[in-house]
């Protein structure tokens, strides 16, 4: 999935999401092109986080369409009973799509029950499908560059 200038990176069309019958996102559409900066502003409880969670495939939409770099991640389908639902791409396709974006969480924390090493190698193993041996080698190199080799087996609460 290559990016070109002016290319549409993300499209969300007529997105719907509800929790326990409470409509949180109702017919939301947006397009983000390469180079654009987008702000999502609204009061607490207005659906900002839910929209972002749907856009990044952390939350499943109830309806609508989600497209990354021209590749459909989810699209609205009507079943034989007339119910509208989202049909998602295969796990393999979603894996490729997820590699197109990154997330920075507002309250970033390490997993407290993982060692430093496990925190570092978890994403490469599960997201990039890197072998454990390769992930550990990369992590050891990174820790050495940072002067933290002695902290590989420490837990987050043990770090200053």
Model-based region annotation:
Residues 114-122:
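Short coil-to-helix segment of the ABC ATPase nucleotide-binding domain corresponding to the Q-loop/switch region
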Residues 56:
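Helix-to-loop junction immediately C-terminal to a conserved catalytic motif
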Residues 154-160:
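Conserved ABC ATPase signature
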Residues 1-16:
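ABC-family P-loop ATPase nucleotide-binding domain
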Residues 71-75, 81-88, 132-151:
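Conserved ABC ATPase "signature" region
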């Amino acid at each position: 999935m290559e990016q070109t200038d002016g290319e549409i990176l993300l499209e969300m069309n007529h997105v719907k999401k509800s929790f326990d019958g409470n409509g949180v996102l109702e017919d939301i559409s947006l397009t983000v092109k390469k180079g654009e900066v987008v702000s999502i502003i609204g009061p607490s409880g207005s659906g900002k986080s839910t929209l972002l969670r749907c856009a990044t495939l952390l939350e499943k939409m109830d309806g609508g369409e989600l497209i990354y770099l021209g590749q459909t991640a989810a699209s609205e389908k009507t079943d034989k009973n007339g119910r509208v639902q989202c049909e998602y791409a295969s796990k393999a396709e979603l894996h490729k799509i997820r590699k197109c974006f990154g997330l920075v969480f507002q309250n970033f924390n390490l997993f407290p029950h993982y060692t430093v090493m496990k925190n570092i190698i978890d994403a490469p193993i599960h997201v990039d499908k890197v072998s454990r041996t390769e992930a550990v080698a990369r992590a050891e190199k990174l820790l050495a560059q940072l002067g933290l080799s002695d902290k590989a087996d420490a837990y987050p609460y043990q770090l200053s």
